[in-house]
């Protein structure tokens, strides 16, 4: 199932790129996500998602499949198992960033595959959940980006 989300952040594309490719920095912005381990370009963690009446918690791994700085395009592969053994989830997430005046337009395309209880919900419900999560993520991300102590661009 393909989900598409579009949003804008009020920082230049270079800053948006530096931020969105810093998984450790942006993970806390994602509702229900928790980063537990970083091993080079591999990230382990868990995410809790409410879909309809079901709350699913997945434990898994994500890694960059593509990081093209000149095109400001990044592809992340993620997969996880429901911690209660009630299914799996896998996603290929592509983020494309383009300059938009003094800000950046970001288009996120997610190719999502889920099994288990969550899979009973159709594309409409999943798209609504995705839209809500991305909305909360963007709000949190904007606040972080606009903090004067923002570390974007630093390596550490």
Feature locations, PLM:
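Hydrophobic ligand-binding cavity/cleft-lining segments
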Residues: 1-42, 46, 50-54, 156
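Intrinsic-disorder/low-complexity, polar/charged segments enriched in Ser/Thr/Lys/Arg/Asp/Glu/Gln
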Residues: 2-6, 42-44, 57-59, 73, ...
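Preference for bulky hydrophobic residues occupying beta-strand positions
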Residues: 5-7, 45-49, 76-78, 95, ...
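Short acidic, gly/pro-rich beta-turn/loop elements at beta-sheet edges
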Residues: 15-17, 54-59, 72-74, 86-88, ...
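Hydrophobic pocket/interface hotspot
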Residues: 16-20, 26, 64, 108, ...
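Glycine-rich portal/gate segments that line the openings of hydrophobic small-molecule binding cavities
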Residues: 38-80
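Beta-strand/loop substructures that line and gate deep hydrophobic ligand-binding cavities in soluble
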Residues: 61, 66, 80-128
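A conserved amphipathic terminal alpha-helix motif
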Residues: 117-153
């Amino acid at each position: 199932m393909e989900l598409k989300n579009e949003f804008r952040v009020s920082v230049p594309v270079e800053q948006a790129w530096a931020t969105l490719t810093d998984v450790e920095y942006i993970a806390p912005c994602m509702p229900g996500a928790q980063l537990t381990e970083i091993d080079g370009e591999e990230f382990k963690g868990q995410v809790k998602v409410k879909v309809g009446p079901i709350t699913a918690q997945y434990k898994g791994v994500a890694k960059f499949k593509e990081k093209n700085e000149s095109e400001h395009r990044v592809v992340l592969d993620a997969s996880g198992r429901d911690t209660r053994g009630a299914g799996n989830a896998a996603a290929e997430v592509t983020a494309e960033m383009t300059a938009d005046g003094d800000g950046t337009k970001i288009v996120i395309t997610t190719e999502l595959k889920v099994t288990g209880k969550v899979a009973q919900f159709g594309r409409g419900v999943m798209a609504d959940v995705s839209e809500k999560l991305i909305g909360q993520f963007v709000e949190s991300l904007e606040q972080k980006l606009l903090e004067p102590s923002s570390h974007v661009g630093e390596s550490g």
